[in-house]
């Protein structure tokens, strides 16, 4: 079965309906999840001059509006032929949509995401992303997540899935018309999906091909532990603070991944800037990097002789 498709939707159905319809038309949808980040009103009795009961009523009303919107999106999916049991929803409350979407990606180990992209009302193919939330997601989502960025029902950017652990934004691809081509009646599929590729999973990592050793003056016999020591991915597995392989990787506000306890020690010792960039941290929150944890676990199982 193909990986589930996750679609990030707004409270206003008019804004996200075209994004959802694009996913239903262009991707092979067997299981679909509707994601929503609810932004509660920040009201206090002192600033609003309202009673707490009135504030609670307003916030409950807004939450109900978000829930009802998800029901409307679900109905759209069902009307387009998706079985009701194959439509699910996931909602969290937060103060930033981009951060909320990234948190949902990590929580659900999402590998296929469709979301709105441009804030510019004048759509053009190949246009740059102007939405701050889309830019944030493109930079902070794990590389195992393929992302389609949609504007007014059209694909404008696509970030391919990969297992390279550098900057997520490096894996962007420009607009491709092939993803917009209609497909045979009764079928929906992603035209940009590579044929005959192995089914992707966030817990998988591809082994690097052996490079030819023509003319190299290297020792022929190497132990398995030495080979694993030379694996370039090791640098991505290590915590920037302790330089040891991470067991509990978490993403900090600077966008880099750290061993959770090492980062907390950094804060307890008085650190207020990023250990990587030395720039002030916007907050001290940590988001679990489930995908990287799985990749590291698999790598260690394949390299049992690695000296930690």
Swiss-Prot record:
Composition bias type Basic and acidic residues, residue spans: 210-227
One Pfam short name: U-box
Family matches, as InterPro entries: Rossmann-like_a/b/a_fold, U-box_ubiquitin_ligases, Ubox_domain, Znf_RING/FYVE/PHD
Enzyme class: transferase
Domain of life of the native organism: Eukaryota
Disordered: annotated segments: 172-235
Keyword Transferase carried by entry: yes
Catalysed reaction equations from the record: S-ubiquitinyl-[E2 ubiquitin-conjugating enzyme]-L-cysteine + [acceptor protein]-L-lysine = [E2 ubiquitin-conjugating enzyme]-L-cysteine + N(6)-ubiquitinyl-[acceptor protein]-L-lysine
Gene3D superfamilies, A to Z: HUPs, Zinc/RING finger domain, C3HC4 (zinc finger)
Record-level Gene Ontology MF annotations: ubiquitin-protein transferase activity
Domain U-box: 232-306
Function: Functions as an E3 ubiquitin ligase.
Protein name: U-box domain-containing protein 54
């Amino acid at each position: 079965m193909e990986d589930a498709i996750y679609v990030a939707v707004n409270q206003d159905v008019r804004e996200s309906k075209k994004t959802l319809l694009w996913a239903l038309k262009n991707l092979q949808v067997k299981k679909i999840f509707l994601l929503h980040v609810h932004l509660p009103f920040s009201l206090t009795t002192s600033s609003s001059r309202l009673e707490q009961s009135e504030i609670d009523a307003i916030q409950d009303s807004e939450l109900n509006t978000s829930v009802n919107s998800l029901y409307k999106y679900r109905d759209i999916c069902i009307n387009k032929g998706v079985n009701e049991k194959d439509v699910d929803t996931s909602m969290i409350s937060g103060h930033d949509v981009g951060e909320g979407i990234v948190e949902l990606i990590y929580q659900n180990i999402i590998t296929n995401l469709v979301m709105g992209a441009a804030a510019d009302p004048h759509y053009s193919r190949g246009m740059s992303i102007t939405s701050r939330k889309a830019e944030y997601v493109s930079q902070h989502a794990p590389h195992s997540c393929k992302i389609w960025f949609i504007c007014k029902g059209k694909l404008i950017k696509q970030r391919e899935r990969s297992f390279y652990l550098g900057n997520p934004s490096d894996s962007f691809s420009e607009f491709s018309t092939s993803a917009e081509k209609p497909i045979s009646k009764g079928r929906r599929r992603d035209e940009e999906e590579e044929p005959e590729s192995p089914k992707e999973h966030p817990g998988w990592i591809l082994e690097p091909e052996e490079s030819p050793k023509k003319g190299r003056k290297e020792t022929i016999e190497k132990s398995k532990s030495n080979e694993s020591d030379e694996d370039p991915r090791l640098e991505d597995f290590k915590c920037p603070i302790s330089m040891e392989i991470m067991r509990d990787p978490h993403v900090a506000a600077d966008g880099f991944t750290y061993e959770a306890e090492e980062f907390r020690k950094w804060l307890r010792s008085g650190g207020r800037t990023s250990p990587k960039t030395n720039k002030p941290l916007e907050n001290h929150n940590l988001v679990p990097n489930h995908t990287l944890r799985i990749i590291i676990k698999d790598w260690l199982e394949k390299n049992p002789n690695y000296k930690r």
